Amino acid sequence: MSFRTLSAILGLLVIQTFSEQNPLTVPTIEPSGINYTRLFSNEMIFTDTWSKDSWNGLTTFAKAPPLRCFGSDAGVLYDVAVLGAPFDIATSYRPGARFGPNGIRQGSRRLGIDRVNVPMKIRATEHIDIVDCGDVPMILVDNKVALRQLELANAALLARPSSHAPEGKSLAKDGKFHPRILTLGGDHTITLPLLRGVAGIYGPVSVIHFDSHLDTWKPRPMEDSPWLPGEEIPITHGNYFYYAHKEGLLGPNNTNIHVGIRGALNRWEDYDDDYEVGFVISHADDLEDIGWKGVVKMIRETVGDNPVYISLDIDVIDPGLAPAPEIGGITTREIKKIFQGLSGLKIVGADVVEVAPAYDTQDEITQIAAANIAWDMLALMAKTPLVA
């Protein structure tokens, strides 16, 4: 036995003997007047003073109140629910987005739902009640079952009444006011069950899709497979809009728009398929040619006065600011300016997807970018009530 090891053992014995002879006690009242019993009680530990620090309390999105939305808190009303969708088994490249909801929440620790969003010129909680419902349990061995779990959970939240009823006629088909859902993904496949939910409440919606890829690819039969002739590739994060179009979930007459497109195509005909699905395209290069104001003009002219769903794939951002496979992307400042230009649109729901913390930098720049974008989405929802 080395001298260092022997010294360490003797040191531990001394510490243990001292602690047994001098047990730690917390005095009720110190000479300074501090009440330690109260200080370490539930009364103080769970007060706002402690929980609002970025390093304290539960890690909900931007310190939103946590709710058991599918359990004991099912009767609590709110205007916007943050919902996690930990799913990544329909990705075509690197998995890891199942950890995205937690990563985005971690990136939001310095934000707060009750803080003033200076660029958006609003304090969201002065207009809407925001809660965090946690994550939907999504099985990781069966795509269909997992997406069905999300669809049912999303529909259950949307069916409830919102906590505020603005003046005017509701956009919803039943004439009632319903909460909105901000979903944290998860690979982009999750947008399909989310669109099913909002379309069930509002009818077809115009989609503003921020992404480097079209995600409207037609599923192709596996003609080259001798074992699966004629079998079709199932729903993935690259073709969910094709299925959304087939199901009648998207706004008609090309009232949907992609923003930030720059990824490679499989064939030139992909553009024709995309137009058939119902999208207008704004490429990433448009930011250089017509600026963010020109892109905003394109978006507003495309979606008109329709109910709008915003879906943002984090790879729309340049990889220098949010590491992802496609170079030449939009900056976070340009995204924020575009969002400012969307004020007044009737946002019925939104998602931020494809955040994979395992591929982020040590500084968590992707998670921080995604969290701030989601925070701006809340501001957009707070700015405009869903009235006709």
Residue ranges of model-derived segments:
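Conserved alpha-helical scaffold segments that buttress catalytic/binding sites
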Residues: 22-388
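Fungal secretory targeting signals
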Residues: 1-21
